[in-house]
A protein has these predicted regions:
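PLP-dependent amino-acid enzyme catalytic core
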Residues: 1-333
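Methionine-biased hydrophobic packing positions in alpha-helices, especially
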Residues: 50, 332-334, 339, 359, ...
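Residues at the N-termini of beta-strands
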Residues: 174, 247, 366, 401, ...
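Bateman (tandem CBS) regulatory domains
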Residues: 244, 327-343, 350, 395-407
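The conserved cystathionine-beta-synthase
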Residues: 344-363, 370-371, 388, 408-427, ...
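Short hydrophobic beta-strand motif reused across regulatory alpha/beta modules
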Residues: 370, 376-384, 437
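A short, polar/charged loop-to-alpha-helix boundary motif
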Residues: 381-400
Length: 437
């Protein structure tokens, strides 16, 4: 058994698995498990390559500070390696990234700066522009800039591509990739153009991104928005040689998330949202073929960073990505049903400190108060603030000291106007379904 001496030695040489329980048409579909890298994603390869090259060229000095703009996974790879090598790290991250990624980055010692995800390149709050400005202002800082760093595609040209070729004995008809920084596409294309020029490249692009437009028409318009993390752009990354892509598929958030969830259920592989996008496009490509082909795509990162989002049914419903059957009455308005175990509740004799802990744990702002299975009140953050004030001892008070009893009950068959009337009075409504809610 091999003994390793640094976590960085575990980067790369990831396993390849053939998928058997999804509809791949006449094709054989293989998934390279980049989620098995120590930082949990394909970006570990890129982070190691960029830091090694910066050290070699003298751009990064011992004890220096690295700055990067990242959707999360490059940051995790950089944080992992920076911690091993003794560098400080500042990461500028769009605010749509999952909490798990943010927690992981900070636990590795990175300083995380959140910025807006609703602005385009050129805006001062855009994450790449923000990172460049920080690097300019901080003496001795090195902006590693994965979007323009040739060591990014170099990682895939020297490791990912030859690994794939060896694992499949050189027989690869198509590779399905996504584009964030463009390094994976650019690096793989460069290597396969030399060693396997017949291999096709297929782009999996989130609906709303401009990259599929560029592939299909040679031009693009304003970007939309999407929830998938890590791939898709509102510009053409210079490292992504889009002209070498043979086909592109636009994948909606719903398709991406449901495909990733299906991958877990059928194949037992916990992968992230970008992996769902790639797999959905790969399945479309495979199903469109009339002759057998050997197709490869990637589990780009682990799904453990998305448990509070993509793998959370409540979050998926709130985003409109999964829906219940419509009943045609007020029960259609219920986001979380208590009879399905989906609500977090308090008891009248719980302490206010217990309520606050539950709000923080579940990231919610109010709780129904239940006694013998019946709602007797509601307690929210304002109730806590109003009753605690600056006196910490008051956290020991029971819920009944702070909750409001101004709750109105409606049968699910009541007219919508009755619900609107309750809201107009500033009250909380509980929808009853017989003896359930």
């Amino acid at each position: 058994m091999t003994i390793y001496h640094s976590v960085t030695e575990l980067i790369g040489r990831t396993p390849l698995i053939q998928l058997h329980k999804l509809d791949t048409g006449p094709c054989s579909l293989f998934l390279k498990l980049e989620n098995q890298n120590p930082g949990g994603s394909i970006k570990d390869r890129v982070a190691l390559s960029m830091i090694n090259e910066a050290e070699r060229t003298g751009q990064l000095q011992p004890g220096g500070t690295i700055i990067e703009a990242t959707a999360g996974n490059t940051g995790l790879g950089l944080a992992l390696i920076a911690a091993q090598k003794g560098y400080s790290l500042i990461l500028v991250v769009p605010d749509k990234m999952s909490r798990e990624k943010i927690f992981h980055l900070r636990a590795l010692g990175a300083q995380v700066v959140l910025t807006r995800s609703d602005v385009n390149k050129g805006h001062p709050a855009y994450y790449q522009d923000y990172a460049q400005r920080l690097a300019d202002e901080l003496p001795g800082a090195f902006y590693i800039d994965q979007f323009n760093n040739e060591a990014n595609p170099l990682a895939h040209r020297t490791t990912t591509a030859p690994e794939l070729y060896e694992q499949l004995d050189g027989r690869i008809d198509a590779i399905v990739v996504g584009v964030g920084s463009g390094g994976t596409l650019g690096g793989l294309q460069a290597w396969f153009a030399e060693h396997s020029p017949h291999t096709e490249f297929v782009l999996a692009d989130p609906a709303g991104s401009v990259l599929a437009d560029q592939v299909e028409t040679g031009r693009y318009h304003d970007a939309g928005s999407w929830l998938v993390e890590g791939i898709g752009e509102d510009f053409i990354p210079p490292l992504a040689h889009i002209e070498g892509v043979n086909r592109a598929w636009r994948i909606t958030d719903r398709e991406a998330f449901t495909t990733a969830r299906e991958l877990l259920k059928t194949e037992g592989i916990l992968a992230g949202s970008s992996s769902g996008t790639l797999l959905a496009a790969a399945l479309k490509y495979c199903q469109a073929q009339t002759a057998p082909k050997r197709v490869v795509t990637f589990a780009c990162d682990s799904g453990n960073k998305y448990l509070s989002k993509m793998f959370n049914d409540d979050w998926m419903r709130q985003q409109g990505l999964i829906t219940r059957p419509q009943a045609g009455d007020l029960s259609d308005y219920i986001a979380l049903r208590h009879d399905e175990g989906a609500t977090v509740t308090a008891a009248p004799d719980d302490t206010l400190s217990t309520v606050l802990a539950r709000m923080r744990l579940y990231d919610i702002s109010q709780l129904p108060v239940l006694e013998n299975g019946k709602v007797v009140g509601i307690i929210d953050e304002w109730d806590l603030l109003r009753h605690i004030g600056g006196d910490g001892d008051r956290f020991a008070l029971p819920v009944t000291a702070a909750m409001t009893r101004q709750v109105e009950f409606l049968d699910k068959h009541a007219p919508e106007s009755a619900l609107h009337a309750i809201f107009d009075r500033g009250l909380v409504a509980v929808i009853n379904d017989n003896d359930r809610f």
